[in-house]
């Protein structure tokens, strides 16, 4: 009789829930074998579910491929809501029908997985561009216009095997340029190209905020990335406003008025 270790090795070779060998393993009454069978089936089902999810997230891209477009760029931004730091956008062109496991809207990816998936995107992407708009410029033009500026900058910054996209998939934004484009609500959850841009923008901005935390300690920028957490608000009260704070955002706007 095969040991449980040997059976686990045999189960690892099965990748189909309809494989006829399941019957043999399911007939083994040992609890360890039954646990191994359940675990392996769970893994296979998770893989199948992930494949379906990735296929669904490629539906916009596949439709565009059929129309003749090749260099399809996903565009997304992070940093609209924080009280400090830049708004950062990324433009990413992935290879045709490229699938990256667990790539999703960056807000849905566990933080500990951000760097890993970011590296996978960077490794396979045909081209990546980054746009960064400072808090000073955000105050001058407003966050909506600053977001558009960051996205346009990301397109112009494209570096890699492709220098110019022939179609843009954008997360909930219309850019007034001649390149054909689609604005997709919650695009980072529905398009793999936009999801790739989302994680690139997120990791890029997080790294910037970690750097700012060293320059301006006491606000917790490495942890809150500029959002208005308790530590951040307490830092504003005790240390004041830094050059990277957005002066048109509350409560900073009111704090500056009171001082004047």
Curated annotation (Swiss-Prot):
Pfam families: RNase_HII
Main location: cytoplasm
EC number: 3.1.26.4
CDD domains in the record: RNase_HII_bacteria_HII_like
Record SUPFAM superfamilies: Ribonuclease H-like
GO annotation (BP), single: DNA replication, removal of RNA primer
Cofactor: Mn(2+); Mg(2+)
GO MF terms held by the record: manganese ion binding; RNA binding; RNA-DNA hybrid ribonuclease activity
Domain RNase H type-2 residues, every copy: 70-260
InterPro entries from the UniProt entry: RNase_HII, RNase_HII/HIII, RNase_HII/HIII_dom, RNaseH-like_sf, RNaseH_sf
GO cellular-component term (any): cytoplasm
Cofactor note: Manganese or magnesium. Binds 1 divalent metal ion per monomer in the absence of substrate. May bind a second metal ion after substrate binding.
UniProt keyword Hydrolase present: yes
Role noted for this protein: Endonuclease that specifically degrades the RNA of RNA-DNA hybrids.
Family: Belongs to the RNase HII family.
UniProt protein name: Ribonuclease HII
Organism: Streptococcus mutans serotype c (strain ATCC 700610 / UA159)
Gene: rnhB
């Amino acid at each position: 009789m095969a040991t449980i270790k040997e059976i686990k090795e045999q189960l690892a070779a099965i990748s189909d829930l309809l494989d006829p060998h399941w019957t043999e393993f399911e007939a083994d009454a040992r609890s360890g074998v039954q646990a191994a069978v359940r675990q392996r089936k769970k893994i296979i089902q998770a893989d199948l579910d992930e494949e379906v999810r990735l296929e669904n997230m490629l539906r916009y891209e596949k439709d565009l491929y059929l129309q003749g477009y090749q260099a399809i760029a996903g565009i997304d931004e992070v940093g609209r809501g924080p009280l400090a730091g830049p708004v950062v956008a990324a433009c990413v062109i992935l290879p045709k029908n490229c699938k990256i496991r667990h790539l999703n809207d960056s807000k849905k990816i566990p933080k500990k997985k951000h760097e890993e998936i970011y590296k996978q995107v960077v490794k396979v992407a045909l081209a990546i561009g980054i746009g960064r708009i400072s808090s000073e410029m955000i105050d001058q033009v407003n966050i909506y216009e600053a977001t558009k500026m960051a996205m346009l900058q990301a397109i112009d910054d494209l570096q890699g095997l492709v220098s110019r996209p022939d179609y843009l998939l954008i997360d909930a934004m219309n850019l007034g340029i001649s390149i054909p484009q689609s604005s997709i609500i919650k695009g980072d959850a529905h398009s793999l190209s936009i999801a790739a841009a989302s994680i690139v923008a997120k990791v890029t901005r997080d790294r910037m905020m970690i750097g700012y935390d060293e320059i301006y300690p006491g606000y917790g920028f490495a942890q809150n990335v500029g959002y208005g957490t308790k530590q951040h608000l307490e830092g504003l009260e005790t240390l004041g406003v830094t050059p990277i704070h957005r002066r048109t955002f509350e409560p900073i706007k009111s704090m500056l008025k009171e001082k004047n």
